[in-house]
Amino acid sequence: MVVHQEARFPIGVFDSGVGGLTVLQEVHRQLPNESVVYFGDTARLPYGKRSPAEIIEYVYEILHWMQSERVKMAIMACNTSSALALDIVRKDFDLPILGLILPGARAAVGKGKRIGVIATTATVRSEAYVRAICESDPQAQVFQVDCPEFVPLIESDRINDPYTLQVARDYLRPLVEVGIDTLVLGCTHYPHLSGILRIILPGHVTLVNPASYVVKAASQELDLMGLKCSCSGKASTNFFVSGDPDRFAQVSRRWLGKLPVVQKVSLSSLELLS
C-alpha cells in the first residue's frame, strides 16, 4: 500500500456546535494517530430550523475553509448537513467527504426491524434516514420524531435539567407506543443525552449512534487511499468556531475532560479573528 505525504494532514470534522464532539471522540478512539481540525458553526446554530438552501450555503463555506486548512478528509458531523448537502457538495471538492446517514442506516437495519429515528426538523423533513433504511432493508419499518428543543438544551448545558427529561419523555412517547426495537440518534448532539434516553426507553431498545459507524467508514476510506497516518508523535486537535469561543470551550469541557483552546474564525474572509 502506498502512503502519501498527505497522510500527515488532519481530518476535518464539522458540526453546528458541540454535537460533533461525539464524532470527534470516535476519531480519537478509532484513529488515535490522526490530527483533527474541528469546526463548530456556533454563530448559526441550530441547523435544524434552517432551510435547505441555507444549509448547503453553510456547508460550502465550511468546506472551502477546511480546504485552506489542508484537511485530507472531511466528516460532516451533522446529520442535517449530511441529509441536505452531502450529495450536492461532494462533486465540487477534491477530497473525500463523509456523512452520517448511510452508515447510521446500515447499522440500524442490523439491529432491528422497527426502527425509530429522532432528529432535527430539517433531517426528519428530508426523509433521508427513511430512504436509506428502507433501501438497506425493505422490510424495515421506520418511525420518525423531530426533536427541535434538544440541540438548544444541550448547547446551553442543560442536560441534567428536569425540563430536559420531560421534553425527552414527550418526544419519545410515540416511539415507545409503536414498539420500536431500535433507536437511531439522528443528530450528533443526541448521544450526549444517552443517559436520559435510557431512563425512558424499554431495556430491549438498541441505541444506534451513527458517529461510531461514520468513523469506521472513514478509517476504511483512509486505508484504501493510503492516507491513514501511521506517524509517531502526538496527534493534535485544533478547535475553531464561528461564534463565541469561550462559550464553546465551557460547554465542551464536559465531554473533552479539559478546557480546550478555541479560536474564532471568519468563514467569509478565511482569516482568524482575535
Named regions from a protein language model:
Residues M1-S274:
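Non-catalytic structural scaffold of enzyme domains
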